[in-house]
Amino acid sequence: MFKHEKRMLQEVKVERPNPQYAAMLQEQLGGPNGELKAGLQYISQSFRIKDPAIKDLFMDIGAEELSHMEMVAQTINLLNGHAVDVGSVDAGEIETHTLGGLAPMLVNASGAPWSANYVNVTGDIAADLLSNIAAEQGAKVVYEYLYRQINDRYVRQTIDFLLNREEAHNALFREALNRVQNKGSNKDFGVTEDSKLYFDLSSPTPPNHFNAPNPTPPGFKNPTQPGQ
């Protein structure tokens, strides 16, 4: 069950309207590394998870991502101002001014519509967790790019909060991956000789080249316990 609380996860505001910044932020609303993609991906993946704690983790983070989506959309709304003006956007998405009446739309920074193809669901807990770790890392990278280019201190505060939450989610998914070392596609990992071969097809071979692997299930040091 979901419910809507009439407050933001964290307050958002802007120094002044800037439709160009709004167009840039559309990437994290309707893009492949955006908040809608993340929320729907984690919630969709949760439906087949049997471990109650991991299922709750996916649902909790998915619900938080939808709260992030609300923050991004409201920031875009404030940056768009009060009058449609295509000329205020030097590059990127202009559908907001030609079609959406300044409403935040489910498109990326170039105006391409959001797609369910962005959502990765395999039904395999290990594969889904690795996909989610990559998704959180990718979202953090996009927020870092936006932070460098948006010169609005309040928008930067919002971006800083969001990218730090991506780091938290990344750490939680890594901890969950450590709990499923013998489940799903992690089971019987690296048990044949074929999995231990390395084909050196590059010539000449550099001095720091890779050698034949010794596959073990993907895992991480426990990110919530730095000493481990």
Predicted features, each with a name:
Residues 1-228:
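Non-heme di-metal
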